[in-house]
Amino acid sequence: MPATIVHAGFIYTGTAAPALEDISLEIVPGTMTAVLGAVGSGTSTLCRLLGGLLESRGTPTGRIETDGTVAVLGDDPEAQLSGLTSHVGDETQLACRLHGLAPATAEARARQALSDLSIDGLWSRDLDTLSGGQRQLVALSRIIALAPDLLILDQPSQSLDPLVRRGLAVTLRAYCAQERSVLITGHQVDELTLASDEVFFLDTGTLTTGRETAEESRVSRVSDSDFATACRAHDVWDTRTEEAAPQPTAVPARAVPASTRPTPAPTQPAPAPASSSPILTVQDLNVARHGNRILDGIDLELHPGELVAITGANGAGKTTLLRSLIGLLDRTASCSGTITAGRLGEGPNLAEMPAHARSRSLGWVGQDPGVQLSATTVRRELMHAVPLPRHRRRDRKRVRAQRRTMVEGVLRDTGLSTVSEEHPFDLDVPRRKDLVIASALIADPRVMLLDEPTIGRDLLGMHRLDAVIAGFLRRGGAVLATTHDRRWARESSHRLLHLAEGRLSRP
């Protein structure tokens, strides 16, 4: 038995409420188990507790037994890249070398892990040139190369496109076929969830096992509608589109009945804006790096009140497109083309401006919110983001009052008022991204550039994102967002574009 958890719980030092309470779970060799829950439900704590990573963080209760080796990939895979290497091959085999394996054995295991994840072509690539999803797979390859008996993955698919997620599901099933086990946790239903043998729900520290219907589940799988209802009841976001939803017989057992807790209705996108003058025009945008063409003649217009979503495979260039618009490409990239704030030929060419000047028209929210945060509280972060107009000394008190009023308004609009005195890095990742969105909004840009805004969000987080975007669009702004969440892209955007081979097209 790779892992047995009996009446386990955990209380973090300095807190009164337990993060986990009375958890009992058995992880059987050769199986893949999924535990889903809302943000803050304790999914990450469960991973760390089972992986033995919380001894100094608080007080555990109950009994946890593991048989064999255990490895954990946290919800921030970037933090598990060593920082000691610059190339994929070296990074992947480093963990094996540190565990004392011979160089030839370590390299063989590393190459096999990359091949299993279908990224063996990245062996010689520089880590800095990889997309967020590719870096996530490299972090996973380091652990798979160690071949632990129990592989614990916290939100392993959050930066991956649907095709890669399906491939990863196949890889993990093959991993389990070697009498090893996998535990995955997350806030969203996706291809990995549907490939699991069992699905559990974690709600405010308590694991719902569905034992009331366990006997029935052994005979017939829970229906797809019941599974979807259970997800909504536990504030789990279901990324499946209607055509992608599996038949009821393919849905994992042990989905639980809906609770009585009300679920807020999603914010519906506003009607597509009427024809109007564009507020951003991109013409013949080209980006290359080391002689390789990444973007090839991109043409794009954004209109007031419009949300345009861009999908594409990992490494297709979605982040590169947004960074080229805001002026944040690294020095190894060359960029050409016209980026006009308005109709082509009528507004300033942003391509000729530095990033700080472009930010007057464009708000930037990157994939990793941590790199855009620097203050000690949420409120101070927003105070720093307020543009400071020129003023005389005698007007300083009035200007400060105006800044405070602006900050209070943005805190309210983005739902951050209740955490205004928290440290940004004490917030969960979706809330941190909300804070970066708020910081961009407070500068009053015409266009918001959102890179993977749905990563790691539960159902409530998705509704919160939709509400913030809807408010911005009603004020006449436009949003350009990249995403791997096809359901959100189809339900929330006015236009859906696909980036492949450097070009944009309608899917």
PLM features: residue spans?
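The feature captures the beta-strand-to-loop junction immediately N-terminal to the Walker
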Residues: 36-38, 311-313
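Conserved ABC ATPase "signature" region
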Residues: 105-122, 398-419
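Catalytic Walker B motif of ABC-type/P-loop ATPase nucleotide-binding domains
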Residues: 151-155, 448-452
